Amino acid sequence: MRRIVLFAALFLILFQVKAELKLPKVFADHMVLQRGQEIPVWGEADPRQWVNVTFQGKKYRAKADKEGKWMLKMDAFPKGGPYILSINTKKESKVLENVMMGDV
């Protein structure tokens, strides 16, 4: 009986582990992105989950693979800012503020 209870508790703990929307450290508030070139954005999310990115009024979408990795390319933009970069999944969102476009 104890084994069954222990197994059930372990099962619940393992399946409650939450996969997070993760971004590399290069994506942060106050970052500067290269102007005039496509901009790759990537990270990790729940496997096979859609990731939505919004920047300067344009929306982009990518689907995480079976390991949770995703990547998309945003259009090239001219210099300017500050802007907001929003990255969302069904469960979570990240907002990067004061994003500038310029020469890196």
What are the residue ranges of the model-derived segments?
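Non-catalytic, glycine-rich low-complexity segments
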Residues: 18-47, 99-104
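Extended acidic/polar, glycine-enriched regions
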Residues: 42-104
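Hydrophobic h-region of N-terminal signal peptides that target proteins for export
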Residues: 9-18
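Positively charged n-region of N-terminal signal peptides that target proteins for export
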Residues: 1-4
